[in-house]
From Swiss-Prot:
Organism of derivation: Orientia tsutsugamushi (strain Boryong)
Region (A): 1-327
Function: Molecular chaperone. Has ATPase activity.
Region (Disordered) residue spans: 483-504
Gene transcribed to yield this protein: htpG
HAMAP family from the UniProt entry: HSP90 (MF_00505)
Name by which UniProt lists this protein: Chaperone protein HtpG
C-alpha cells in the first residue's frame, strides 16, 4: 500500500506550536507522557481480555521497553498493549485534543470506570515528543488484527500513514529522532532518571534495553500507597519514606488513608523525626508529591497541604483531580481545596492523638516543627481553634511546656485572660519585669519566643472565650483574681515583706513629678499593678500593638518608628521611694532628675528599644558611679 498523506485537523499548526513551545515548561516530561500512554494501552488490553482472552495471543505479561540508538539519534519506546489500527491512528494521533483514553472511558459503564487504571485524559501528551524530536514514527498493530501500520510526522501540519510489517504480535513502537540541541536525552543515565522520577510507581514494568540487548527493569512497578495498611510492614513504610523524602531519619508518624466520596484520593504522609535545614527557606518546595493514577505529576505549584504543614513528606494520589491541558499546571479546582481540607483535618487529629499518647515525644515534634505549625494561626482560618488545641507553650510558673487547655484548667477565680509575653530569649523573658506581679500572684504567663509568635497574637485574640492578652498592656486586670497576696520585695533584700502602698496624695505627687521630668518622652506615667521587684517598666495602652511585636516590625522595616509608651512605676521600690522622699524634702532635685531619666532608659533597654541619647545615658551612669565611689 502506498503512503497516504493527511492534514492535521483545523488550527493544528497553532496548537502544535503551543504544545512544543508553551504548554510544557519541563521538556523531560515527554517521556512521562509516552510512558503514560503505553501504560494506558496495556490497561485497555488487560480490561478487554477479561471478556476476550484471545486478544492476548498467548502473551499475558505486559511491559514497556525504552532503548536508544545514540549514533542515529533515536529514542525508542515500545509496549505490548492494545495497539492501534489505521482508524485509531487517524483519530488518536491526527487530531489534537482527542484522546483515545477519553473515548475508551466514555464507552465503559460507570462501574467499569472505577476499576480501570487509565491515565491519559487529554489528547496532547503524545505531541510533547516534538519538544525534543524533529520527527516521530509510530508502528502499531492492534490486538486481534493482522495488519500493522506506520504513522509518521515532523509536526509541521501533515502526517503519513502506510501499511507495514511489525516484528511484534501486538502493541505500539514509537521512535523519536532527537533534535541536536537535546543531545542530553541521548544518555541512558538521564533516561533512567526520568523514568524513575515520573513513572516509578506505574504498575506495568518498564525496562531499559542496553546496547547489548539486555533488559533492566527501571521502575518499581508498585505503589505502596495503593496497598492495604495491614499488608505493609513498618520496615516497608520506612524504606518508602527514605526514598520519597530523600531522608536518613525514621518517620515519627505515618498517616495512610484512602478517601471516598466527593473526591477519591489516597494519601501516604509522613511526619519526620528530625528538622530539615531548609524548613524556613522562602523558596523551599513542597515535599508532598502529586500523583494521578500512580504517575508523578508535580511537587510544585499545587496546594495539597497548607504551608504551615510543609514539614510533611509523602504522596497524594487521585483519579479525580482536574488538570489543565498540559498536565503540568493544575486548574484552579475546588477539588484541591477539598483534598487540602481533608488532609489538614487528618493531620491535626493525628497530632492531637500523639500529644495525648506521649507528651515527651510530642514535645520533640514541637521543638522541631511547632514554629511552622503556628504559622497557621496567622491565616485566620476555621482551623485556628483546632490548631491552638495542639499547640504547646512554655509556662513561666511551671517552667515546662503546657497546652492552652492546661493553662485554663489552672486559672484563678475571676481570671478572664490568658497572659503571654513575646521575646527572643527564654531566660530574658523569665526575668522580665512585665511578669513579676502576675507570677507573685501565681498567675501563669506563656513565654513566646518564636518569630511567628509576634504575628499570630495580632490576629488570634481568643481561645474558648478566653482573651489572649499581652502582659505589656497597661490594662492588666489582676486585682480581682482569687489568689495569694502579691509580695513586693525591694532592692535592700532585707527579707522583710514590704506591701504597704503610698497614699493617693503621695502617688499623685510622684506621678506629676515624673511627667514634668519626662515630658513628651512618654505617653503617660502610671502606678503599676504588676511590678514587685523592679522599679519601672514600659507598657502600651489597651488595644495597642505589643511592644515586642512593634520592635520586630521595625527591625523588618515594616514600621518606621516606635510609638509613645506608658511608663509604669513601682512606688514600693527603694529607688522610687528615694525619689519620692527627695520630692517631699525638696532636696537633691538634680540627682532626682538624673534618676528618673536613667530609669526610663533602663526600661528602654529591657524591652530592646534603642535609647534616644546613648551618650547622655552613659554620662548619667558615670555620674552615679562617681558618687558611689566617692
Amino acid at each position: 500500500m502506498s503512503v497516504e498523506t493527511y492534514k492535521f485537523d483545523a488550527e493544528v499548526g497553532k496548537v502544535l506550536h503551543l504544545v512544543i513551545h508553551t504548554l510544557y515548561t519541563n521538556k523531560k516530561i515527554f517521556l512521562r507522557e509516552l510512558i503514560s500512554n503505553a501504560s494506558d494501552a496495556c490497561d485497555k488490553l488487560r480490561y478487554l481480555s477479561q471478556s476476550n482472552a484471545e486478544l492476548l495471543q498467548g502473551e499475558s505479561d505486559f511491559k514497556i521497553t525504552v532503548s536508544m540508538d545514540k549514533e542515529k539519534r533515536y529514542i525508542i519506546l515500545q509496549d505490548n498493549g492494545i495497539g492501534m489500527n489505521k482508524e485509531d491512528l487517524t483519530q488518536n494521533l491526527g487530531t489534537i485534543a482527542s484522546s483515545g483514553t477519553q473515548k475508551f472511558l466514555e464507552q465503559l459503564g460507570n462501574d467499569a470506570k472505577k476499576d480501570n487504571m487509565l491515565i491519559g485524559q487529554f489528547g496532547v501528551g503524545f505531541y510533547s515528543s516534538y519538544m525534543v524530536a524533529d520527527e516521530v514514527k509510530v508502528i502499531s498493530k492492534k490486538a486481534g488484527e493482522a495488519q500493522a501500520y506506520q504513522w509518521s510526522s515532523k509536526g509541521e501540519g501533515e502526517y503519513y500513514i502506510e501499511d507495514c510489517e511489525a516484528d511484534f504480535i501486538r502493541g505500539t513502537k514509537i521512535t523519536l529522532h532527537i533534535k541536536p540541541e537535546y543531545d542530553n536525552y541521548l544518555d541512558h543515565f538521564q533516561i533512567k532518571d526520568i523514568i524513575k522520577t515520573y513513572s516509578d510507581h506505574i504498575s506495568v514494568p518498564i525496562y531499559y534495553v542496553g546496547v547489548d540487548g539486555k533488559e533492566q527493569q527501571v521502575n518499581s512497578s508498585s505503589a505502596l500507597w495503593t496497598r492495604s495498611k495491614s499488608d505493609i510492614t513498618d520496615e516497608q513504610y520506612e524504606e518508602f519514606y527514605r526514598n520519597i523524602a530523600y531522608a536518613i531519619d525514621k518517620p515519627w508518624v505515618t498517616i495512610h488513608n484512602k478517601s471516598e466520596g466527593v473526591i477519591e484520593f489516597t494519601n501516604l504522609l509522613f511526619i519526620p523525626s528530625s528538622k530539615t535545614f531548609d524548613l524556613f527557606h522562602p523558596d523551599r518546595k513542597s515535599r508532598v508529591k502529586l500523583y494521578i493514577k500512580k504517575v508523578f505529576i508535580t511537587d510544585e505549584n499545587v496546594a495539597l497541604i497548607p504551608k504551615y504543614m510543609r514539614f510533611l513528606r509523602g504522596v497524594v494520589d487521585s483519579e479525580d483531580l482536574s488538570l489543565n491541558i498540559s498536565r503540568e499546571t493544575l486548574q484552579h479546582s475546588p477539588l484541591i481545596d477539598k483534598i487540602q481540607a481533608s488532609i489538614t483535618k487528618r493531620v491535626i487529629t493525628e497530632l492531637e492523638k500523639q500529644k495525648t499518647k506521649d507528651q515527651g515525644e510530642y514535645e520533640t515534634f514541637w521543638n522541631n516543627f511547632g514554629a511552622v505549625l503556628k504559622e497557621g494561626l496567622c491565616e485566620g482560618t476555621a482551623d485556628v481553634d483546632k490548631l491552638l488545641k495542639i499547640c504547646l507553650f512554655r509556662s513561666a510558673l511551671q517552667d515546662k511546656f503546657i497546652s492552652l487547655d492546661e493553662y485554663i484548667a489552672n486559672l484563678k477565680s475571676e481570671q478572664k485572660n490568658i497572659y503571654y509575653i513575646t521575646g527572643d530569649d527564654l531566660e530574658a523573658l523569665k526575668s522580665s519585669p512585665q511578669i513579676e506581679g502576675l507570677l507573685s500572684r501565681n498567675i501563669d504567663v506563656l513565654l513566646l519566643t518564636d518569630d511567628v509568635d509576634k504575628f499570630w497574637v495580632m490576629v488570634t485574640r481568643k481561645y474558648n472565650d478566653y482573651v489572649l492578652k499581652s502582659v505589656t498592656s497597661a490594662n492588666i486586670e489582676i486585682d480581682n483574681c482569687d489568689t495569694k497576696t502579691a509580695k513586693s520585695s525591694d532592692t535592700n533584700n532585707d527579707g522583710k515583706d514590704d506591701t504597704s502602698s503610698s497614699d493617693d496624695q503621695n502617688c499623685e505627687q510622684l506621678i506629676k513629678y515624673f511627667k514634668e521630668v519626662l515630658g513628651d518622652k512618654v505617653k503617660s506615667v502610671e502606678v503599676s499593678k504588676k511590678l514587685t521587684r523592679s522599679p519601672v517598666c514600659l507598657t502600651v495602652p489597651e488595644g495597642s500593638m505589643d511592644i515586642r511585636t512593634e520592635r520586630f516590625l521595625i527591625e523588618q522595616k515594616q514600621l518606621s518608628s516606635h510609638s509613645s509608651k506608658i511608663l509604669e512605676i513601682n512606688p514600693n521600690h527603694t529607688i522610687i521611694k528615694k525619689i519620692n522622699e527627695n520630692i517631699k524634702l525638696n532636696q537633691n532635685l538634680d540627682v532626682n532628675k538624673q534618676l528618673v531619666m536613667t530609669l526610663l532608659d533602663q526600661s528602654y533597654l529591657i524591652e530592646g528599644q534603642p535609647i534616644p541619647d546613648l551618650q547622655d545615658y552613659c554620662n548619667r551612669i558615670n555620674f552615679f558611679i562617681e558618687k558611689s565611689v566617692n
